[in-house]
């Protein structure tokens, strides 16, 4: 199936819907417990980075993740689940509020943690590739 096939749009949209709902549920779960640090966004970005690495490696190296499943899971679900724009906004809010420790921890931790999670996902997929 080509990327401009109508089913491709539906797969990405359905995955994005589910990823967005999952992100919202994570935010609800974390909201009472994280008044100072944006743990929900941090968590979904780290988890999403792992998933993108894991699923992309399987899609490239095996037949376990089909091109259609990759559209649904990686482009759709993970695209809806991860939150770069929220990450930037929450980082700017921490800086504006003078929370320089949390600002630094959040931005650097998200980048380093995201990279480590992505690479870990790739390594975790290797037994199947």
Swiss-Prot record:
Organism for this UniProt entry: Chlorobium luteolum (strain DSM 273 / BCRC 81028 / 2530) (Pelodictyon luteolum)
Regulation of protein activity: Na(+) is not transported, but it plays an essential structural role and its presence is essential for fluoride channel function.
Membrane topology, from the record: Multi-pass membrane protein
Protein name, entry field: Fluoride-specific ion channel FluC
Reaction catalyzed: fluoride(in) = fluoride(out)
Family the UniProt entry places it in: Belongs to the fluoride channel Fluc/FEX (TC 1.A.43) family.
PANTHER family, per database record: FLUORIDE EXPORT PROTEIN 1-RELATED (PTHR28259:SF1)
Primary location class: membrane
Protein location: Cell inner membrane
Function: Fluoride-specific ion channel. Important for reducing fluoride concentration in the cell, thus reducing its toxicity.
Membrane-crossing segments per the record: 10-30, 35-55, 71-91, 105-125
Entry's Gene Ontology molecular function annotations: fluoride channel activity; metal ion binding
Biological processes per GO annotation: cellular detoxification of fluoride
InterPro entries hit by this protein: FluC (IPR003691)
Keywords: Cell inner membrane, Cell membrane, Ion channel, Ion transport, Membrane, Metal-binding, Sodium, Transmembrane, Transmembrane helix, Transport
Pfam family, one: CRCB
NCBIfam families (alphabetical): crcB
Signal peptide as annotated in the record: none
Binding-site residues, Na(+): 79, 82
One GO cellular component term: plasma membrane
């Amino acid at each position: 199936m080509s990327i401009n096939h109508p089913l491709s749009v539906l797969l990405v949209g359905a995955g994005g819907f589910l990823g967005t709902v999952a992100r919202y549920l994570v935010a609800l779960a974390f909201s009472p417990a994280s008044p100072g640090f944006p743990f929900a966004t941090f968590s979904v970005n780290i988890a999403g980075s792992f998933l993108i690495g894991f699923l992309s490696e399987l899609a490239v190296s095996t037949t376990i993740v089909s091109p259609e499943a990759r559209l649904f899971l990686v482009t759709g679900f993970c695209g809806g689940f991860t939150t770069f724009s929220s990450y930037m906004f929450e980082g700017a809010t921490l800086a504006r509020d003078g929370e320089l420790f949390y600002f630094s921890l959040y931005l650097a931790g998200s980048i380093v943690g995201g990279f480590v999670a992505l690479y870990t996902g790739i390594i975790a997929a290797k037994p199947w590739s």
